[in-house]
């Protein structure tokens, strides 16, 4: 199921996703999505809820839902009223966590920590320890779509092992609510006061909001009683219209890659390649790692190349220098702590962008190196998996940490007025990254302040100097008082460039966007410096 939005708005520490007609806003809460409509004619707007519900262990029973309801009652959470008589949404499951007291504690979260051993076993059909993380929602900022999963992504909290969900426990549902939970109502108060009302059409047709159905079946609409028990049944007319999505049939495309001379180099690495998300083969990255420096830097590397290929060699050599400097004089940028050559860093940089289907010269770089390998008959050994993993994770986490800190800082309109020394390059990169994040979150309107640029620049300055991400986050947290930066970057340090599932896909997409934004401003700055 997909819900489209046009822009985002921060209101009372909640991220709201506003539709194109500005009459409806969504927000994520504990792996579920709430929808609130603009009040009209002194009447409250329609309130709806979308997401996964827990049901039972078979097609007919509701054992799991009853278990959750029973546990909520035993814990004295009488104010919590699951929607309907049979199903319980994921955000109610969150309340079984001892650290969560109300739905307000899990606002802006796409997943649910299930620490209850019995419930975790229901979800996975396996005994798990210490618990599992169940993800039901993904926000695709690039497409401006909130995606609700037909089947959740479930991973072990500690080992990140991925489980297959039990077949009957989860179902996708859509519910009409008479009101929001009491803990969430204050967060929505005054929301539409800051969103200009659209001009009403002359024909005054009833509004409708399309819900795109991408799964095998449409979710069953429910009329929530808001009391968790039997109530008076009444008919309701919803503004939501379910629309089935049918994939376009296309002919498969085949991507070509330069074959190296060594037969074992054409085989995918047995560990990394199987664990890697879809994208260009990792063996192509390994070719550049192994022979890229020689292909671009050797005095006779250009022999036998066409004029266009010679220009490409010069271009890649120049870009590696502009971004990362030289081995003897490295430039302050992402990946400063990695013991790699500028060409190797450039290859990883382009690979992380290219595998998310963004424009990148990575294929051209691979072709040049492949030509060099063939012309010189080089033997390319099997990929060094630890080296590739360390390189990709290092640059991936640096970029994701920088972008995540930018997102966190933009949540604060006012930051402490201090004079923090920041280098010109770090300041320029900070401004570019903040503008990119702002374009993904808010309507254009100058929400990036000099303080935002200064404090993100301070974070980048520590990172560019080769210090750790947590050290940079701690430094910035002390300057701003935003201690959540340390926790957020700690979460980034536990992520991997090879993570699968919705969370992994979202992290890869965001990282590619951050890398692309920084690449553009760095190359433009270097070009301007040359012209001056």
Swiss-Prot record:
Keywords noted in UniProt: Host cytoplasm, Host nucleus, Virion, Virion tegument
Disulphide bridges: none
Ranges annotated as biased composition (Pro residues): 257-276
Location of the region described as Disordered in the Swiss-Prot/TrEMBL record: 251-276
Compartment(s) of residence: Virion tegument; Host cytoplasm; Host nucleus
Listed Pfam families: Herpes_UL21
Tagged with keyword Cell division: no
GO cellular component terms listed in the entry, alphabetical order: host cell cytoplasm; host cell nucleus; viral tegument
Role, per record: May participate in DNA packaging/capsid maturation events. Promotes efficient incorporation of tegument proteins UL46, UL49, and US3 into virions. May also play a role in capsid transport to the trans-Golgi network (TGN).
Subunit field text: Interacts (via C-terminus) with UL16.
Sequence similarity: Belongs to the alphaherpesvirinae UL21 protein family.
Protein name, UniProt field: Tegument protein UL21
Species per Swiss-Prot/TrEMBL record: Human herpesvirus 2 (strain HG52)
Lineage: Viruses, Duplodnaviria, Heunggongvirae, Peploviricota, Herviviricetes
